[in-house]
A protein has these predicted regions:
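Hydrophobic secretory-pathway targeting helix
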Residues: 1-27
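Lumenal/extracellular ectodomains and adaptor appendage modules
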Residues: 17-226
Length: 227
């Protein structure tokens, strides 16, 4: 009897606990449709919009790295651009949270959702699809010490809005890391260092002038013998 109870508890633990459902979003907030066999990440300082190609799936799971409240506004559209209904819930498996999207029938099209953003982006692909990372407008990864890309992309291009796009083909099991910054950040830093240098020169000049003035005053006093 105890063995059966332990087995039941183990099965529940492995299958996960289902949390309340997540409200779906509006497809108009995303740059849909996506691209076949591709996952696209539109980076932003406050959020990341993800568009993932799904082929003939009754359900799909997405790992949630942060709190469960950070998985927001999920939508699904088919290849014809029609909005597809789905149930979205949060499940916990082996102490890890996943967003579970369940469709009424096998679905092919694009799933989009929003997750937290920032100037540092990390993603570990688990399949062999193409990964596209789109930086915000007027941002880049090009300046050493301020930005970096790991591993080296297979292609770097720009879209019609001038946004930088990083592309990895067959990126399975390659941890992708991107840090980006504003295009004018190096110039701003140059101005800052220049201002600090000018201030340092002013302080040095004032110090040198004060020392010289005191030295002359001492030499003048030494010319007159003490009585």
């Amino acid at each position: 009897m105890k063995f059966v109870l332990v087995l039941i508890l183990l099965l529940v633990f492995l299958q996960g606990c289902i949390s309340p459902t997540v409200k779906t979003g509006d497809p108009s907030r995303y740059e849909l449709p996506g691209i076949a066999n591709t996952t696209i990440f539109y980076l932003n300082l406050s959020s990341v919009q993800v568009i993932n190609n799904v082929v003939d799936r009754a359900s799909v799971d997405y790992k949630i790295e942060d709190s469960i409240q950070t998985f927001r506004f999920p939508v699904a559209i088919d290849y014809s651009g029609n909005n597809v209904s789905m149930n979205v819930s949060i499940i916990s498996i082996m102490a890890k949270n996943y967003a579970h999207l369940n469709f009424t029938a096998n679905f092919s099209g694009f799933v989009a959702f929003t997750m937290p953003g920032g100037q540092d982006f990390t993603y570990f692909p688990t399949d062999n699809s193409t990964i596209r990372v789109v930086l915000p407008e007027n941002f880049t990864t090009a300046t050493i010490f301020l930005g970096y890309i790991q591993p080296k992309p297979d292609n770097i291009t720009k879209d019609s809005s001038g946004r930088e796009i990083l592309v990895w083909n067959n990126a399975q099991n390659k941890k992708i890391k991107v840090r980006y910054h504003q295009n004018d950040t190096p110039v701003m830093l140059l101005y800052l260092f220049g201002s600090l240098l000018v201030c340092a020169l002013i302080v040095w000049g004032y110090y040198h002038y004060s020392i010289s003035a005191l030295k002359k005053k001492r030499e003048t006093l030494e010319k007159f013998p003490r009585k």
